[in-house]
A protein has these predicted regions:
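Acidic/aromatic-lined carbohydrate-recognition and catalytic surfaces
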Residues: 2-187, 191, 204-254
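Hydrophobic residues within beta-strands of alpha/beta enzymes
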Residues: 49, 197-199
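Conserved protein kinase catalytic-loop anchor
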Residues: 194
């Protein structure tokens, strides 16, 4: 991973694709627009581009609710334009890193739709809980956005945890099958030629065993039970050992 430590002194230019240059004339920024501005970006003296989410998404949270981790949203030009940008950036000596968002997915992701139907092996891909014996929510955690962190699912007849929007169910990273999925996502993009990832809310991926109530925090209730959780370092080391160490890449944690 970064054998020559090329990433130590790099300057990255962040691109929020929707607000960048509109290349196809539909009024929204896209990868064609990025491609057309690669010389300009290089002229700024930067060493690489960091893309905010480009994946297919219903758009409940500006693209951070991902419905497919192995594609590029059609509205941004799809995979064809992404490959052109990647090749063009590399030809100009610039690296390309992407956002990696694996604390949660969109509720429209295939995994979640199968999980709520209890279809193996996806049954425990997310954090599902029944109500407490007294009829209350599984715990008293708050969502980072608003309201409580639990949403009832009529189909499964259980609650699912969402630390962010209701449409962003949290993945169950304690499930080794989920961690394997993450590793396959990493391999997919690294094999394509991406140079690394900015890991979004990565400190939230491990929740305290038992998901206990939070009796101390009056605001952001529950955060001490999932921020820098018990297995964060263990899981990140697993991703590094099994995938990242086999590529010349970089990861940056939020």
């Amino acid at each position: 991973m970064g054998r020559d430590r090329w990433y130590k002194d790099m300057v990255f230019y962040q691109i929020w694709p929707r607000s960048f240059k509109d290349g196809d004339g539909d009024g929204m920024g896209d990868l064609q627009g990025v491609y057309e501005k690669l010389n300009y970006i290089k002229s700024l003296g930067v060493d690489g581009i960091w893309f905010s989410p480009l994946y297919p998404s219903p758009g409940a949270d500006c693209g951070y609710d991902i419905s497919d981790y192995r594609d590029i949203a059609a509205e941004f030009g799809g995979m064809e334009w992404f490959k052109k940008v990647l090749e063009g950036a590399h030809a100009r000596g610039m690296k390309v890193i992407m956002d990696l968002v694996v604390n949660h997915t969109s509720d429209e992701h295939e995994w979640f739709q199968k999980s709520r139907r209890r279809i193996a092996p996806y049954t425990d891909y997310y954090i599902w809980r029944k109500e407490k014996p007294d009829g209350n929510l599984p715990n008293n955690w708050d969502s980072v956005f608003e309201g409580k962190a639990w949403q009832w699912d009529e189909l499964r007849q259980e609650y699912y945890l969402h630390l962010f929007a209701v449409k962003q169910p949290d993945l169950n990273m304690d499930n080794p099958l989920v961690r394997q999925e993450v590793k396959e996502i990493l391999r997919f993009w690294l094999e394509l030629g991406v140079d690394g990832f900015r890991e979004d809310v990565i400190t939230f991926i491990s929740k305290k065993d038992g998901l206990p109530d939070d009796r101390l925090m009056p605001a952001a209730r529950g955060i001490r039970h999932y921020n820098h959780g018990p297995h964060v370092h263990e899981y990140l080391e697993e991703f590094k050992r099994d995938v990242l160490d086999h590529y010349d890449c970089v990861t940056l944690a939020e």
